Amino acid sequence: MKEITVTEPAFVTHFSCSGSACRDHCCKGWKITLDKTTVKKYLASKDTAIRTIAQDHIILLKKNNSHWGEIKLPSALGNCPYLDEDRLCRVQKTLGAKALSHTCSSFPRAHHTYKNEVRNSLSLACPEVTSRILNDPDAMALSEKTIIQQTFNTAPLFPAQQKLLNLFCLSLINHANSSTEAALYALIKFVMYAQKFAKIDDAALGELEQVYAALLEQLQTGVLAQELMNIAPDSKVKTSLVLQMQDYFRSLPLNRGSVILDHYIQCLLRVLTAEEGVSMEQKVSDIESSLARCLQADEQQKNWAFRNLILYKIWENNFPNQPNVDPLRALYIIVAEYAFIKLLTAASVHERGRLEWDDVTNIVYSFHSRSQHNSEVAKNFHRHIETVRTGDDLSMIHLLT
């Protein structure tokens, strides 16, 4: 028998689907794939409604056993035909949870499997997941348990060096207090130092531990926050990000989350173009000031909401250990996503005159629903971010100023 370590953040442990109460349920507006077993089960079901819907609404593709068919939706934003009048799944109610396809039974859950470890996570494309991360100060607290199984998983080993690097990065962000930007600045410095080593061995880790300790002290004493404030801002980097991002999202076909995200993008564009004679760069500065004032007045949630979002990104992506991705480039993507989400939030605050965390939840989940619902969608989105980066990874510092 073999021991397997299972690690997961608190938001995973405590997650439960909100069902019919969900603000934007996952049974609509995107591709629902069905495996071969599920297709055959529905087509042969003794339940007349299940069988009839299968005959009328399952498109047989037979690409492979995992992608044998797809649900045909009535429109780009239409509901799955198995969703009943109470916004609950007819299959689950009639046949039980075991009758669900892999797609329907697994979302929003994700499992990153290694030889003797499993890291559990959840997708931010689910609004309930996003709400937990933004509203629970302990959402990213990690816990471990050991399970026993007959054999090791058929997956590569999770190297101890990679695990330690990931923990260093998580810890730097976790000590951000209310300055997530300063913590990201510390992370940039840490990654730049790590890239000096051709190989991360025990000797390199010894040096990196000293660098981590020094950066942590500079974070806690406010040195890095002051250093970041002293960097002359370049708002053109942010306006370029806005234009590229809105261009990308508006070019996508309609799917789940598109109406919500477009509402906030339109809000941002209105705010940035409202006054003639005022540059977009100045308007960016104005709306950021509005958000900063509202965050300053928020005595609690400001200290963890955006910090938790970055912690999630580092955990979910096993940063900085993504295969075949330069760590600075991977960090640029994290910073660019964070900056755009903050700008959408700032525009909403500027128009409303107040900060509503429900707006932030809407922005974050719809952003991820549109950009990272699956690996192929995420790759296309990250390729688009490359046009903003213009070959200069360190321009991300200007997204933090």
Swiss-Prot record:
Keywords: Methyltransferase, Transferase. It comes from the Bacteria. Its EC number is 2.1.1.-. GO terms for biological process: methylation. GO terms for molecular function: methyltransferase activity. Disulfide bonds: none annotated. NCBIfam families: Lys_methyl_FliB. Post-translationally modifies flagellin by methylation of epsilon amino group of surface-exposed lysine residues. Belongs to the FliB family. This is Lysine-N-methylase. The gene is fliB.
